[in-house]
């Protein structure tokens, strides 16, 4: 599954990746192998010692113990990414998906792409158009992207589906 996420993000050694919610660092380790630099933002203070232990050999990872919704994402991306657009990768819980993605859009940060793993229901809702009962904030935000913004950046694609047993075991 981690390889599929890295592939979906189109990651290279030249990329700076912003990982939202790295948890104990399992995906972060793989991201550090695929990307040039990884910025891992984790809100849970209790996970930081575990995360740092897991990532002790990953010299290209910076761990930040903050709430992604309260960080100046643009400033962080510009400082850590050297002015180049960053790629965002996250495994988002249902209840926080919309605020995080909206925050990324509204940050003005130089973002190359956003690759997130979300529940099927969220992915389905992200792909509906105007007039659907499920049309919501994320769909609306996609629809008002400036004309100079590449549709490629705004494309919503289901790259792969997670089997039910994997969803349960990852809880």
State what each model feature region is.
Residues 1-171:
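Catalytic cores of RNA-modifying enzymes
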